[in-house]
Amino acid sequence: MMKIFYSAYTCQGNIGDLLITKYQIEEYAKYAEVFVDCHGMPQYFSKVIFDTNNPNVKDFEKIYGLYYRGKNIFKVLRVLNNGGFGFFCSSPGPRVPLNLPVRSLVLKMLGALIPYVVLNKRIKRYSLGVDLQFERTGFFYWINRWYFGLFDIIGLRSKENLSTYRGVLNNICYIPDMAFLFPYFDEKKYRCNHDKIALSFRNVTEYNVLIDKLKNILRYFNDKEIHVDLIYQVEEDKSFCERLMCDLAENNLSFKEKMVAYSDLEVYENYDMVISNRLHVLLIGAMNGAIPYGLISHDKKEKKIADVFSSVFSCKLFSYVENSSSAVIATLFCERDSVRSQIYKNVCVQRNYCERLIERLFN
């Protein structure tokens, strides 16, 4: 059976990064043994990754006594060359481009060049379900073009991102966000009304604008006697959501003190709509039958929502905060049955596309 080395070193404390890494590993493990290196990640992260019924998901560090960091790198590469490995893969999410300071630049260049030189040419390097963002002119354009060109395949999770770099890199393709591989996907979830809405936000600079828009949205749902919960899925969002709660308290809003953990993701099936500026709050909401609506700023962390949603959904399900209208959200809510039916179809297309592409890449 094929063997994949998988470096699961990603953002810590973000359930979104955990879930897309988990779903990707499980999908890869349908076609190969996946040896996962979780070194440096929190214990709960490793626990989720290795809590699986698939015997093809294996703990690389436990089996080989090595991890892909520091002085161990050459030892790991030797194991991959001599141990029958065919693929070198890493977690999905944003790919950090090469940039200053010099020390960081040199280390990243070496980190990319060493496996490219040392690994057997038969070992392919994949990075699937990611975003690219680097300058299109000057020194860093050329060096990042070289850097990302070392991969055999880079799968970009939005068609906008693909269009931007299509003429720059010849190793890129489109692949949907790994959240579409959510394992508890069920058409029945798209046919139930709950008369409940969820809000969830990360910190924003346009705070006063956001508050004004949320007050208008809450006023509409209060008039309709629709219950609204304020929730958070990333620990660092808690304090910001508490601040929102203080300023929106008179709007009949309920704050959920407990963070939505990986084991709690099906809580989203209790909502008709999820309004957020967190991509994986929105996508997991969509996978559980809720209408995802992105209320976003122009920050690059939030702009990816516009890019992904434009690639996925046949109706516009996001707006920039300054241009947002409660009337648009009201229309989506009033037409929720037909909107959710269309979302289900869109999700099926993305899910199937993702599964077929991964199967093709590893077969």
Regions found by a protein language model. Name each.
Residues 1-363:
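Active-site anion-handling motifs in enzyme catalytic cores
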